[in-house]
Curated annotation (Swiss-Prot):
Signal peptide: none
Cross-referenced Gene3D superfamilies: mk0293 like domain (3.10.20.300), Transcriptional regulatory protein pf0864 domain like (3.30.70.1380)
Top-level taxon in the UniProt lineage: Bacteria
Keywords: Nickel
Organism of origin: Citrifermentans bemidjiense (strain ATCC BAA-1014 / DSM 16622 / JCM 12645 / Bem) (Geobacter bemidjiensis)
Protein name (record): Putative nickel insertion protein
One Gene Ontology molecular-function label: nickel cation binding
Residues that span the membrane, as ranges: none
Pfam family, one: Ni_insertion
Family, as annotated: Belongs to the LarC family.
Length: 385
């Protein structure tokens, strides 16, 4: 399984991420061709070799050729990506990043998610950075992403909302649940886009996972800090963990006094925050009270973040957790062509093909046909790998 490790020793930004992926093998021309699937223009892409403190890296720059670019709301960006010609997995990754970013902006500005109005992020260059990251991860075949802690930074930064403290409020919101590293000096080290990429896609934090490195990419930021090279280091490698074996935590609590309608929202919040699986099962508690057992399977690094969600989004006043190991069948995520269009599917090593729910749901809504019919069509036409 291909894994990527983001070593954010100097921070992370959207352009640094795309630059590192280019250095790892994403051709700039492929990036241009894939981005052509988005319904907007008025920009050019440039990538070049640079040096930061004597270390060679790659920079990535988006230059606007049309000055009059509209600001965009989150709802419009989400619809634009969904209606584009991008691959299903690229759409899914980009949507996860944008939604995480929109949630942070909504929390900071106190507005509903649908009304979030992006300024810097709504600009073409930031849309390119986020979608470009999704394109790069898909092109390189990355199936799991891990990251180091993030530097907090200090000082002030100029934004569309005026002069704000570092990290910007949206960045600070996105950093919740992510380990922070020691102070490395003045300046903005993590941008909202960079924080959103890590918050939305990282499967765990800390040192690199067991892996055999296949390549290293250095993505250079625009600024040149005096303390250390302004580079994002991304390691691409093959996982060396026992095939299909993974250390996890099981988080549990029993709930007997909550409106059942809230359970669905609780599950959504946990899955969006990185839970590997969430399940509800009925049980009888003392005095024969009917209740629900919430079980969350999680990466050990996500314990604090997921526990906080359980305690804030439910009536639970406590929970328990314990380590466990799980074994999963080796699988890859692929895009298959069907009579209904491109569909994302999981392909197991046995050859069995399983349709991806989000991809099938999108087709069902677009074509106005029952979801079960989409599943049957995909299973019939894709069959065995």
């Amino acid at each position: 399984m291909k894994v990527a490790y983001f070593d954010c020793f100097a921070g992370i930004a959207g352009d640094m991420t795309v630059a590192a992926l280019i250095e790892l093998g994403l051709p700039l021309e492929v990036l241009r061709q894939e981005l052509a699937g988005l319904p907007f223009s008025g920009y050019t892409l440039e990538s070049r070799k640079v040096e930061r403190h004597g270390v060679a890296g790659t920079s990535f720059k988006v230059t606007l050729t049309e000055a009059d670019q509209p600001h965009r709301h989150y709802s419009g960006i989400a619809k634009m990506i969904e209606a584009s010609g991008l691959k299903p997995r690229v759409k899914e990754l980009a949507q996860r990043i944008f939604r995480r970013l929109a949630e942070a902006e909504a929390a900071v500005h106190g507005v509903p998610l649908e009304r979030v109005h992006f300024h810097e992020v709504g600009a073409v260059d930031s849309i390119v950075d986020i979608v470009g990251t999704a394109i790069g991860l898909d092109y390189l075949g990355v199936e799991a992403l891990y990251a180091s802690g993030l530097p907090y930074g200090r000082g002030f930064v100029q934004t569309a909302h005026g002069r704000l403290p570092v990290p910007a409020p949206a960045t600070a919101e996105l950093m919740e649940g992510i380990p922070l590293t020691a102070d490395i000096g003045e300046g903005e080290r993590v941008t909202p886009t960079g924080a959103a990429i890590i918050a939305a896609l990282a499967d765990g934090f800390g040192p690199p996972p067991p892996m055999t490195p296949l390549g290293t990419g250095y993505g250079a930021g625009e600024k040149d800090f005096p303390e250390l090279p302004n580079l994002l280091r991304v390691l691409l490698g093959e996982s060396t963990e026992a095939k299909g074996h993974q250390e996890v935590l099981v988080i549990e609590t029993h709930i007997d006094d909550m409106n059942p309608e809230i359970f669905g929202f609780l599950m959504e919040r946990l899955l969006e925050a990185g839970a590997l699986d969430v399940a509800f099962s009925p049980l009888q508690m003392k005095k024969n009270r009917p209740a629900t057992c919430l079980t969350v399977i999680a990466d050990p690094a996500d314990l604090e973040k997921l526990s906080a969600i359980v305690l804030s989004e439910s009536t639970a006043i406590g929970l328990r957790y314990y380590p466990a190991r799980r074994v999963t069948a080796a699988r890859s995520l692929e895009t298959r062509e069907t009579t209904l269009g491109e569909v994302a599917v999981k392909v197991l090593e046995t050859g069995r093909v399983t349709p991806e729910y989000d991809s099938c749901r999108r087709i069902a809504l677009e074509k106005g046909i029952p979801l079960i019919e989409v599943y049957r069509t995909v299973e019939r036409e894709c069959g065995q790998a």
